[in-house]
Regions:
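Short, well-structured N-terminal submotif of metal-dependent ribonuclease cores
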Residues: 1-25, 35-56, 78, 107
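Short, C-terminally biased terminal segments at protein or domain edges
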Residues: 107, 117-121
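Active-site neighborhoods of divalent-metal-dependent phosphate/nucleic-acid chemistry enzymes
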Residues: 57-104
Length: 121
């Protein structure tokens, strides 16, 4: 999403090629982006995030996601492949929903077993 807002790569054009009903954003991802917008004091970024939140579904992080998060986090820790709490939550969310995660951070997310990832950059 951050690349689409910045106009980097092919992200924005790939997003608009999909109907909004086929897309969603994790509430965790939205929170991470809101944090960045506040750190930058960027009203422009907040307006872009408002538009995204009105256009696509914002998926809530629920109890099933929390259970998946615990399982994935423990497995990654056992293997010494920790990717950070936020990325683990995002991965758990995608797995719980059974969706493909769109990311440019394949280095981290490829460590999560069974997670489908695609890079639209």
């Amino acid at each position: 999403v951050s690349y689409a807002i910045r106009g980097a790569g092919r992200v924005a054009e790939t997003i608009v090629s999909h109907p909004p009903s086929q897309l969603c954003i994790s509430a965790i991802t939205l929170a991470e982006l809101r944090y960045g917008a506040d750190r930058l004091s960027s009203q422009k970024l907040h307006r872009a995030l408002d538009t995204i939140a009105r256009t696509v579904s914002v998926a809530a992080f629920d109890e099933d996601c929390a259970t998946t998060y615990g399982r994935i986090g423990a497995k990654l820790a056992e293997r010494g492949e920790i990717i950070g709490d936020i990325d683990t939550m995002i991965a758990a969310h995608a797995l719980t929903l059974g969706v493909t995660l769109v990311t440019n951070n394949q280095r981290h997310f490829s460590r999560v077993p069974a997670l489908r990832i695609v890079n639209w950059f």
